[in-house]
Design a protein with these regions (language model features):
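Active-site oxyanion-binding pockets that recognize sulfate/phosphate
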Residues: 170
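Conserved small/polar residues in nucleotide/adenosyl-binding loops
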Residues: 178-179
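ATP-dependent adenylation/nucleotidyltransferase module used to activate substrates
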Residues: 1-163, 173
Length: 179
């Protein structure tokens, strides 16, 4: 039974080991967890055939299975229209103008963090937990949250989270912060 003061964590599930471990750790620490994955493509076959794809149907199924085994509710957020507008259209435009675009950075900025945080607030959850290796600490002297490298330098992914606002940093828990 969930208590009214139980902290709630929305787990950004990629279907991989790191986000699965993050979900497990948060559940073990007594959080009310839900797992979520972003649907990014209108075409159901898009991204499925590649071994290292992002948010493919295989990834969704893997994340769903992990959540089922842990007894965590699971949802897929359909961000396919936003993905086309905020990531793919920007990618094509930049490429046509001779730039070297990075669609993963735009996806992180506009979808994974912006839209996911919006959903977190709508669902009245306290944190977004990711499988990224980084740390977030509050510095009382500076009166702000600091994004720091992971404890293990070889796995550091703090660069992925560089664009987070102070409000977002206050509500994110990367995997290396969950231990």
């Amino acid at each position: 039974m969930e208590s009214d003061n139980m902290k709630k964590a929305l787990i950004a599930m990629s279907g991989g080991v790191d986000s699965s471990v993050a979900a497990y750790l948060m559940k073990e620490h007594g959080y009310d967890c839900i797992g979520v994955t972003m649907k990014l493509f209108q075409n159901e076959d898009a991204g499925v055939s590649r071994k290292k794809s992002c948010c493919s149907l295989d990834d969704v199924e893997d994340a769903r299975n992990v959540c089922y085994r842990m007894g965590i509710r699971y949802y897929v957020f359909n961000f396919s229209e936003r993905f086309k507008e905020d990531v793919m259209d920007r990618f094509v435009d930049a490429y046509e103008h001779g730039a070297t675009p990075n669609p993963c950075i735009d996806c992180n900025r506009y979808l994974k963090f912006d839209k996911m945080f919006q959903r977190m607030r709508e669902l009245e959850y306290d944190y977004i937990v990711t499988g990224h290796y980084a740390r977030v600490e509050y510095d009382e002297e500076k009166n702000r949250y600091l994004l720091k490298k992971a404890v293990d330098d070889t796995k550091d992914q703090s660069y992925v989270l560089y664009m987070l606002t102070q409000e977002q940093l206050a509500h994110i828990s990367p995997v290396s912060y969950t231990h």
